[in-house]
From Swiss-Prot:
InterPro entries: Cpn60/GroEL, Cpn60/GroEL/TCP-1, GroEL-like_apical_dom_sf, GROEL-like_equatorial_sf, TCP-1-like_intermed_sf. The gene is groEL3. Together with its co-chaperonin GroES, plays an essential role in assisting protein folding. The GroEL-GroES system forms a nano-cage that allows encapsulation of the non-native substrate proteins and provides a physical environment optimized to promote and accelerate protein folding. Transmembrane segments: none annotated. Keywords: ATP-binding, Chaperone, Cytoplasm, Isomerase, Nucleotide-binding. GO terms for biological process: protein refolding. It is found in: Cytoplasm. PANTHER family: 60 KDA HEAT SHOCK PROTEIN, MITOCHONDRIAL (PTHR45633). It catalyses: ATP + H2O + a folded polypeptide = ADP + phosphate + an unfolded polypeptide. Its main location: cytoplasm. Belongs to the chaperonin (HSP60) family. This is Chaperonin GroEL 3. ATP binds at T29, L30, G31, P32, D86, G87, T88, T89, T90, G414, N477, A478, A479, D493.
Length: 549
């Protein structure tokens, strides 16, 4: 395939044009008085948002060379969002400033590799400075401040997120769901909740509520399919002699085996319920083992040399209470050892640290939360679908920021911590172009505060100059126009968000500065193409070979 190439200064300028196009669209949303962006959708109403990564994901430039620059900055926002869940606009603004200042230095004759070394050394020094001055989140009030700030100063969202995390803790699961009812509410689930319910409505014990409630039941855990009555009979006889009730978690129970259990329930001879085991494939056995630890039982599986016809009461799990509905199962106060449960949680945390796939990370986080006994559900309702999407984005950003604050602590917000950390760069001894790399970082870290001030209607340069002279932790509150202690204003940022924004921006910017050649597929003119606005290159009759079937 033929390729189109650009070199040296021209290549870097095209990349910078793409960086600026994306960053200019995103940075107007920064700060408490940032504006929204309206994004067209080919189907349905447009999306209104001030979430940086949501805007960045929608941007695709026509010029393929400039588009590469835009995609690199999009990677900055995406990486920051994936790691910290917030701070995407700050990361984008930092990346733009680093690229602008860095390319100016390269045009002046600086060696890009030495600039890169200086930038990396400066970022490392700033991260050490954040560690020195970070504070811990002290109580729900601090958490609410962080959450409110991330939700664009919506105190109601901040309070709800703080209440949710305050109850379930950093390891707990907080899910965000759409609600048909206008407003915002949070509910909590005690114990372990699974998404699977009973296999048959004949298993309910309360016909009004259509739920099966069991006290001190025996619980059989297996990853096998059960269809024959003979397979279950040994377990039923054991539980019957013990005078108990039985809950079966299995891959499936069907045919005569299910019919027998249903008949026993209908006639009142033996109470039991069947729930499909959680998870799929290899994850099913892992999640069953989680349940076994929580319930103090064993998973009956042929892989472990165990069979259903030789089950003992000691291999069955126990709990104080289990409630099963058509779609969910809640288990409270399992009989498992606290020591073993904590050991299992630690094992899952180690797996989470190694996991790279986002789906695996979410699954592990959910499993940790189940064993920790903490699940909260935030339900979000709005008048219109457009408002609902915008509100959901703010709740998710708020939740991510609050989690980050619990994980690594907080620093002064509103761009103050970044600007005032510049004092750490004074102690960094570098020479030549590496020293210029340090100064590039010094100038770039003032940009978030400058744009927060500009978006609020103030002189950005004047605000930066004044905050640089204030005592550490004192800054500019763009919401009110006041100068003072940022913690007192309730303007605090998670260290994790600030750190990830700086690291992601510096990583991409340093690589971009060392670029000398751009290579794209050559665009082929197709004058016979039908123009259909809104469909990119294909709409204009410009087709790349990779788009041709």
């Amino acid at each position: 395939m033929a390729k189109d190439l650009r070199f040296n200064v021209e290549a870097r300028r095209l990349l910078e044009a793409g960086v600026n196009a994306l960053a200019d669209a995103v940075k107007v949303t920064l700060g408490p008085k940032g504006r929204n962006a309206v994004i067209e959708k080919l189907t349905g109403p447009p999306t209104i948002t001030n979430d940086g990564v949501t805007i960045a994901r929608e941007i695709q430039l026509r010029n393929p060379f400039a588009n590469m620059g835009a995609q690199l900055v999009k990677e900055v926002a995406t990486k920051t969002n994936g790691t910290a869940g917030d701070g995407t606009t700050t990361a984008t603004v930092l990346a733009q400033a680093l690229v602008r200042e860095g390319l100016h230095a390269v045009d002046g004759g600086a060696n890009p590799m030495f600039l890169k070394n200086g930038i990396e050394a400066a970022v490392a020094a700033l991260l050490e400075e954040f560690e020195k001055y970070r504070g811990e989140v002290e109580g729900e009030a601090d958490l609410a401040r962080v959450a409110t700030l991330a939700a664009n100063n919506d105190a109601r969202i901040g309070d709800v997120v703080a209440a949710a995390l305050g109850r379930v803790g950093c390891d707990g699961v907080v899910t965000v769901e759409e609600s048909p009812i206008f407003g915002l509410e949070v509910s909590f689930v005690d114990g372990i909740e699974l998404d699977n319910g009973y296999l048959s409505p004949y298993m309910v014990t309360d016909t009004e509520r259509m739920e099966a409630a069991y006290t001190d039941p025996y619980i059989l855990l297996t990853n096998e399919k059960i269809s024959q009555v003979q397979t279950l009979m040994p377990v039923l006889e054991l539980v019957t002699r013990a005078g108990g009730q039985l809950i079966v978690f299995a891959e499936n129970v069907e045919g005569p085996a299910l019919g027998m259990l249903v008949a026993n329930n209908v006639h009142g001879t033996f109470r039991s319920a069947v729930v499909r085991a959680p998870g799929f494939g290899h994850r099913r056995l892992a999640e069953l083992n989680d349940l076994a630890v929580f319930l103090g039982g064993q998973v009956i599986t042929a892989d472990a040399g165990l069979s259903l016809d030789r089950v003992t009461l000691g291999q069955l799990g126990r709990c104080k209470k289990a409630t099963i509905t058509e779609h969910a199962t809640t288990i409270v106060d399992g009989a498992g050892s606290a020591t073993e449960i904590h050991a299992r949680i630690d094992q899952l945390k180690r797996e989470l640290e190694r996991a790279e796939n986002p789906h695996d990370q979410d699954t592990l986080q959910t499993r940790i939360a189940r064993l920790s006994g903490g699940v909260a559900v935030i339900r979000v309702g709005a008048v219109t679908g457009v408002e609902l999407k915008e509100k959901l984005h703010r709740v998710e950003d708020s939740l991510a920021a609050a989690r980050a604050a619990l994980a690594e602590g907080v620093v002064a917000g509103g761009g103050t911590a970044l600007l005032q950390a510049a004092s750490a760069l004074d102690k960094l001894t570098l020479t030549g172009d590496a020293a210029e790399g340090r100064e590039i970082v010094r100038r770039a870290i003032a940009e978030p505060l400058r744009w927060i001030a500009i978006n609020a209607g103030y002189d950005g340069d004047e605000v930066v100059k004044r905050v640089a002279e204030l005592p550490r932790g004192h800054g500019f509150n763009a919401a009110t126009g006041e100068y003072g202690e940022m913690a007192g204003f309730g303007v605090i940022d998670p260290v994790k968000v600030t750190r990830c924004a700086l690291q992601s921006a510096a990583s991409i910017a340093a690589l971009l500065l060392t670029t000398e050649t751009l290579v794209v597929e050559e665009v082929i003119g197709n004058p016979g193409a039908v123009i259909a606005p809104g469909f990119g290159d294909l709409a204009e009759g410009l087709v790349r070979p990779s788009n041709i079937a």
